[in-house]
Curated annotation (Swiss-Prot):
The gene is hcp. HAMAP family: Hydroxylam_reduct. The modification Cysteine persulfide is found at residue 408. This is Hydroxylamine reductase. Binds 1 [2Fe-2S] cluster. Transmembrane segments: none annotated. It comes from Shewanella baltica (strain OS195).
Length: 554
């Protein structure tokens, strides 16, 4: 086992990364090894997808499968060995299918079949024991003694960034958004990473390419969400329980939320969002469901307590899931899509009757709690509508600075930095937030500036796209570069979606970003220095020192 993809990975003087019997996330060594083998097989599929494309062969089913299965290897997504093995076997099937199509096309065209790299040649074992025996060939640091640590760090930066992009591709696909060109570029990068490179410049360029690719993917996802559900609008949301039977929907998948709402109409069940599903409450399409009553709980890391206290059924539509046995609710949590946990019921297809039956059998909330409301829904359409007023207040001096504070949340004590930063921002500044990092301060009162709320909740982590659109619009109005705006970005990171959002921002030329609470363990000190020199990327220090620098720089 070797896994170093998330913020909570083991860090020791002897080396970084989880490499024992179990990762810090709870992932067993066998599961980690099977996930590495899955990635290896997916890279082999991409090798043939690239070659097949050169001869005009495009398989949309395979284009959709590869990022979806890759998504299963993200932090806190799928811990079920049987499901991981099934994805791996399917990858082997698709690779063979593409290989046959490619070779047939070569024969028809009268050209030679090209030699493929080792990553596309593995004959997959048929049992778990055989697959685990093959796993060392797929170990991410298998050649660590032969390559410079900076090269290893760049490889991992690319791999983990591409994982994040794969997740957003799958979210977009669920909403009907696919793009053959995007899929083709995705395969090219997967294929490239399947042949471990020692070219630092090429790896760095690839990392920026992944960022650019993800910008296109975020635009696809934004189009999918707004076409399906309308543009988010400023919305007041209750965060306290309502009396009655209940279902809690967590993750990111709004299509699943829609299906659950449709299937619970008239059944006397209240539906609550959780975590990154909170932004759904701002979409017009969901406001026609009166039994979508509000948001319950906070960010993913608190779920073992929050789900244990929730007296209804819980649905995990995507990341992040952690051990449901700790809170003794494994019999009433359900997984969807790429999510998996051993022994937890997985919902295939679009029938949520098992979830509904479980909710009806449980007690539900026995009384209403005193409401506490927050305001959400400031995605790019709402931000653009407010832009003239924002510009006027900037010109008058009423608004002097913008802060984007958000990203992933986590359970480390030093993440209190983000709470203190938000509370310490000047009264003449605006705070934009997104992702589950918002839960560090989104229930606090920040007031307004001439009717413009000081705290603007932009949405999910992928809604960094909305924040980018606002920054571009403001830069155009003020006829300046984005980096010349009175704008400071402070991103909390935990997993691979945050990595690819960072790569996206860097690829767009956004500079002077701060990340925290700790730097990725796979980034060497030298790589961190290069990123600081090239982009001004730096780690958070103290609220007082960082605020002083940010406000002075602006």
């Amino acid at each position: 086992m070797f896994c170093i993809q998330c913020e909570q990975t083991i860090r020791t003087p002897a080396g970084n990364g989880c490499s024992y019997s179990q990762g810090m996330c709870g992932k067993l060594a066998a599961t980690s090894d099977l996930q590495d083998l899955l990635i290896y097989m997916l890279q082999g599929v991409s090798v043939y997808a690239v070659k097949a494309r050169e001869l005009g062969i495009i398989d949309a089913e395979i284009d959709s499968f590869v990022p979806k299965a890759f998504f299963a290897t993200l932090t806190n997504v799928n811990f079920d060995d049987e499901r991981i093995m099934a994805y791996t076997q399917q990858a082997a099937h698709y690779r063979a299918q593409l290989k046959a199509s490619y070779e047939a096309a070569c024969e028809q065209a009268g050209i030679a079949v090209e030699q493929v790299p080792q990553v596309a040649q593995l004959v997959l074992g048929t049992s778990k024991i055989e697959m685990l025996a093959q796993a060392p060939i797929a170990l991410l640091n298998k050649d660590k003694h032969d390559v410079h640590e900076d090269i290893m760090g760049l490889r991992l930066l690319c791999l983990y960034g591409l994982k994040g992009a794969a997740a957003y591709m799958e979210h977009a696909r669920v909403l009907g958004q696919t793009d053959a060109d995007v899929a083709g570029r995705f395969h090219e990068i997967m294929s490239f990473l399947g042949e471990p490179s020692v070219d630092g410049d090429k790896l760095f360029t690839t990392a920026m390419d992944i960022g650019q690719l993800n910008y296109r993917i975020m635009a696809m996802l934004d189009a999918g969400e707004t076409q399906a559900f309308g543009h988010p609008e400023p919305t007041v949301v209750n965060t306290k329980p309502f009396k009655g039977k209940a279902i809690l929907v967590s993750g990111h998948d709004m299509k699943d939320l829609e299906l659950i709402l449709e299937q619970t109409v008239g059944k006397g069940i209240n539906v609550f969002t959780h975590g990154e599903m909170l932004p759904a409450l701002a979409y017009p399409a969901f406001k026609k469901y009166p039994h979508l009553v509000g948001n319950y709980g906070s960010a993913w890391q608190n779920q073992q307590q929050e789900f244990a206290n929730f007296p209804g059924a819980v649905v995990m539509t995507s990341n992040c899931i952690i051990d449901p046995n700790v809170g003794s609710y494994s019999d009433r949590i359900f997984t969807r899509s790429i999510v998996g946990w051993p022994g937890v019921v997985h919902i295939e297809g679009d029938d949520f009757s098992a979830v509904i039956d479980k909710a009806l059998a449980l007690e539900g909330f026995i009384y209403d709690e005193i409401p506490h409301t927050i305001t959400i829904g400031f995605a790019h359409n709402a931000l653009m509508a407010a832009a003239p007023a924002v510009v006027e207040n900037v010109k008058s001096g009423a608004i002097k600075h913008f802060f984007l504070v958000g990203g992933c949340d986590g359970d480390k004590a030093d993440r209190s930095y983000f709470t203190e930063l938000a509370k310490s921002t000047p009264k003449d500044s605006i705070i934009l937030t997104l992702g589950c990092g918002k839960y560090k301060f989104n229930k606090l009162e920040f007031g307004d500036i001439n009717g413009i709320p000081r705290l603007l909740d932009v949405g999910q982590c992928n809604d960094a796209y909305s924040a980018i659109q606002l920054a571009i619009a403001l830069a155009e109005v003020f006829e300046c570069d984005i980096n010349e705006l009175p704008l400071s970005l402070v991103l909390s990171w935990f997993e691979q979606k945050a990595i690819v959002v960072l790569l996206t921002l860097l690829s767009l030329g956004v500079k002077n970003i701060r990340t925290g609470p700790t730097p990725p363990a796979f980034l060497t000190a030298n790589l961190a220095k290069i990123l600081e020199e090239k982009f001004g990327l730096r780690n958070t220090t103290t609220v007082e020192a960082d605020l002083k620098t940010m406000l002075n720089v602006a």
